[in-house]
Regions:
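Hydrophobic structural segments
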Residues: 3-219
Length: 219
């Protein structure tokens, strides 16, 4: 039979596909997303992960993957040196590319924010504000019962900041919500679920009548 030539996909082409789903320009200005190492390299396999750690790089090597796609950026603060044993050093040493989709993936339709809202059993999920998603519970819950529902749905410990009122409409922000509670409040939400929230932001939200359930972003 005739030989068929198959063009190898490059890391940049992989990033372009991700960018069509979660546009890179939608990332926050402080974020560091896109191809963080090895744009022109061919892709022999892709490993997907939340964080690129040394263990993840070693797994990519073991599996023969030449690219790793992660949610959290492997390079966030400016690097002054490549320290042996760290993830950026190991990526460079083994010639493995890194593509990171962070806040752009949080905001994307069908992205992390929508996935969180779906996991909580919300219906009528829609954007509200720059980052927040809003949806409705199947039935009204009191704050303690709602916190237990969130903990069971996500399988992580949660912290409840109880504003005392029943909960039916819920706003969610994956990652660190902090001041974004105001978007949920402005959208007439009864509660706000996020992965991280500073103490003073939580107190401000409670004073405004918004119950907050805070998960564990690092888990």
């Amino acid at each position: 039979g005739a030989e068929v030539s198959v063009e190898m996909v490059t890391v940049q082409q992989l990033a372009d596909v991700l960018g069509r789903w979660a546009p890179w320009d939608d990332a926050e200005q402080w974020d560091n997303v896109g191809v963080l190492a090895g744009a022109a390299a061919p892709v022999s396999g892709v490993l997907c992960t939340l964080d690129i750690t040394p263990a993840v790089v070693h797994e990519a090597v073991r599996r023969g993957c030449s690219a790793v796609v992660s949610h959290h950026p492997v390079i966030f603060s400016p690097l002054k040196a490549l320290v042996p044993g760290t993830a950026p050093y190991l990526l460079a040493r083994h010639g493995i590319a890194a593509v990171c989709a962070h806040t752009n993936l949080d905001k994307a339709p069908g992205g992390v924010g929508d996935a969180l809202a779906t996991a909580l059993g919300l219906s009528g999920i829609e954007p509200c504000g720059s980052y927040c998603r809003r949806g409705t519970l199947p039935h009204e819950m009191m704050p303690r019962g709602f916190a237990a529902h969130v903990q069971a749905a996500l399988g992580v410990p949660v912290r409840l900041v109880d504003a005392g009122a029943p909960v039916r409409t819920v706003g969610v922000v994956s990652g660190a919500g902090d001041e974004l509670w105001a978007e949920a409040k402005a959208a007439a939400c009864d509660a706000f679920v996020t992965g991280e929230m500073g103490h003073h932001h939580a107190l401000d939200a409670r004073e405004a009548g918004l119950t907050c359930v805070v998960g564990t972003h690092h888990r």
